Amino acid sequence: MAINAQEISALIKKQIENFQPNFDVTETGVVTYIGDGIARARGLDNAMSGELLEFSNGTFGMAQNLESNDVGIIILGDFSTIREGDEVKRTGKIMEVPVGEALIGRVVNPLGQPVDGLGDIETTGFRPVETPAPGVMQRKSVFESLQTGLKAIDALVPIGRGQRELIIGDRQTGKTSVAIDAILNQKGQDMICIYVAIGQKESTVRTQVETLRRYGALDYTIVVTASASQPSPLLFIAPYAGVAMAEEFMYNGKHVLIVYDDLSKQAVAYRELSLLLRRPPGREAYPGDVFYLHSRLLERSAKVSDDLGGGSITALPFIETQAGDISAYIATNVISITDGQIFLQEDLFNSGIRPAIDAGSSVSRVGGSAQIKAMKRVAGTLRLDLASYRELEAFTQFGSDLDAATQAKLNRGRRTVEILKQPLHKPLPVEKQVVILYALTHGFLDDVPVDDILAFEEALYDYFDAHYDHLFETIRTTKDLPQEAELDVAIQAFKAQSNFK
């Protein structure tokens, strides 16, 4: 049989062309150091910053330091079984978390894995934890009100949808209570809430989850928790995971309230990681980019344009101060990033004024444009009245010889302080807030004893519910005050039939 060299050559060429190599090419490296939530590895010369890397035990890490000899990695999970010499490989992906409706009502860790014992979360959607914030032209002005249900906030430091409002104060001054009450008040408001617990005790997180469940708020809330017992990388990544979940809803035209409790602990975790990765320390041993740590997080909260769905993320970040020092490094950083701050004072808290909001140091830079018209009309001078009362109260300590006008201001001020008090987990709808503040600013409480103010308030609401519910409905639907004469008649009728003369 004659062998045709040309045919053989053509056959070999065809085989080569059709050859499909089944190689899985992965760049791998070797762990050279492991400890305290970080690892170093050699051989990953092409790793990208923020890339997910997989260790031989299945744990993932994130590339943070790209150096000439090795890569500094933060480990997102258990690192107790990782050893020097273990293999670590590139994945070519960046960190993503599951997102979507399936997460609502669940308690998850910063990787999106459920920790509430209610089974797996069935969702197909994922979002990267690090994404650019919306640009200037992708945003809208804040104009829709977000009601917290707390008179002291809704009247003095109003918050709008898409705003970033810092809650700052010492430990045990009621910061978490303010945020939980704000979440409870979103029931029926078409809002999705995300509570991010950073470095909290697991028992504390359990208590907050039970509170949300008891009041029916878990039906529209996601809880993301990185407890104090977890490695620093998870505390560092938790807020970014929370806002990634929020962005999924925002870009689908929904409104989200996200609470970061608290960013001081995230900054401490980031400082710990940075020092372990041998980054140069700066002021208070924080790394040079600690401002960027918080700015890139909080800038992702926005009211986006109609082209992007018109949704919003409203952020309530917490910062814990030491001895009321709001001029500390992290505190001033976050104050400069946010659109205002609510300062909770220990002295006020201990004297029974709760929420312990210091009206003089608290401000909302953009919330005024979102405040409803009715609240603007009744609370317009409230802040000034309160400030002048505090000033006069300081003067009265030096002498008691006061003229009638000064005495009247002091009397009104004492009643204002009482009215702004509120029991825990009892947020008020805005129409009730407007009515009681109207009664206060128009002098209807001037003859009511200070000790009876809170009882007067409760009785007034019950009376209006029974006889003047249409006034509540008017405020609720029109966002404006009803006829003042009608309000005056209603309040006078209540006083006439009550024991509060």
From Swiss-Prot:
Q: Which GO terms describe its molecular function?
A: ADP binding; ATP binding; proton-transporting ATP synthase activity, rotational mechanism
**Annotated localization:** Cell membrane
| InterPro entries to which the protein is assigned, alphabetical | ATP_synth_asu-like_sf, ATP_synth_asu_C, ATP_synth_asu_C_sf, ATP_synth_F1_a_nt-bd_dom, ATP_synth_F1_asu, ATPase_F1/V1/A1_a/bsu_N, ATPase_F1/V1/A1_a/bsu_N_sf, ATPase_F1/V1/A1_a/bsu_nucl-bd
Q: Where does ATP bind?
A: 169-176
Catalytic activity, as annotated: ATP + H2O + 4 H(+)(in) = ADP + phosphate + 5 H(+)(out)
The record's similarity note reads: Belongs to the ATPase alpha/beta chains family.
**Protein's recorded name:** ATP synthase subunit alpha
According to its UniProt entry, this protein's organism is: Streptococcus equi subsp. equi (strain 4047)
